[in-house]
Amino acid sequence: LGRNAAEALQMLQAVDKANVVGGYLEDLCYTPKFLKSLAAVKAGSIGEVIWTKSRETHPGPHSDWFWDKEKSGGGCIIDLGCHCVEISRNFIGKNIKPIEVMCWADTRVHPIDAEDNAIGLAKYENGAIGQFEVSWTFRGGMDLRDEVMGTEGTIWVNNFLRTGFEMFTSGKGGDYIAEKAES
């Protein structure tokens, strides 16, 4: 929630001093589609998670302050990447730490002093890879998709389709999968 580590620490100290719970709600982690996919992962339906991919792209923010790096703290990575990383952490496991991170970012379209496109990879201590794609230059509305690949299957979550949940498994997946799914 802070623009940098110092601001985040300042907020954490204020929360501790006030003896309250602090945080932010990552709402996409609580949608029915996501909860269904997370339950399938936890049940072992796709085996061991080896790779997650989260994409959040759109033409850019509505609020002017987002475009100002001094006010927002950065570009599309700080705006959208935080959501994608949290999606991956839910699938991979919140107690599993990243050990290596790399990112490519560039300003391609908007005349701003921050990135408007980025791709990042995080390798976790269990060998899983988390990938994010974020953009403020995507044309075609908003694109919000998540994938989780395991040793025994794959789940695709498209947050803008009616059903928007597909699972392919060679493991434990014989239960009800999605509303109006066709065989």
Where do the PLM segments sit?
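Alpha-helical scaffolding segments of alpha/beta enzyme cores, especially the outer helices
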Residues: 10-13, 39, 119
